[in-house]
Amino acid sequence: MQCPYCNADDTKVIDSRLAAEGAQVRRRRQCNQCQERFTTFEVVEVVMPRIIKSNGRIEPYDSQKLKRSIQLPLQKRPVTLDEQEAMISRIEKRIRQLGEREISSKGLGEVVMSELKELDDVAYVRFASVYRDFQDIEAFRQELQNIRPVDEQ
């Protein structure tokens, strides 16, 4: 690691500790040339799979696009921003755990739908109506039947 004070390449680690609840490693380093000390943080680089669109085009994963796509169906629903952020984290974790370099937009949509279904039924139906391109009231009825079986109605 290069020293930020004298730019020497010869530094040594004098202390290492976990930080940010185990998501980072904090290291105290000392330059062997100027003896200055400095702190570095080490984190895992997370690489998300690319998204294969329905037209075959491949795009990089965009967390902001995912966030926007779930904010719309959640408008005016009793879901906090913390709950939304937690859901986005779960979605991203599930996608990473697939271990694939690419995922179809359809596969991503299914993961989003399963998370929305757990979080808020109304938001789930709103998202499903756009994602599955409902054309008539019967499509809504079918989806509602999937959420709430006949014996619960």
Curated annotation (Swiss-Prot):
Its cofactor is Zn(2+). It holds the Pfam family ATP-cone. InterPro entries: ATP-cone_dom, NrdR-like_N, RNR_NrdR-like. One of its GO terms (molecular function) is zinc ion binding. It comes from the Bacteria. Binds 1 zinc ion. Residues 49-139 form the ATP-cone domain. A zinc finger (unnamed) spans 3-34. Keywords: ATP-binding, DNA-binding, Metal-binding, Nucleotide-binding, Repressor, Transcription, Transcription regulation, Zinc, Zinc-finger. GO terms for biological process: negative regulation of DNA-templated transcription. Negatively regulates transcription of bacterial ribonucleotide reductase nrd genes and operons by binding to NrdR-boxes. Belongs to the NrdR family. NCBIfam families: transcriptional regulator NrdR (TIGR00244). This is Transcriptional repressor NrdR. The lineage of its organism: Bacteria, Pseudomonadati, Pseudomonadota, Gammaproteobacteria, Moraxellales. The gene is nrdR.
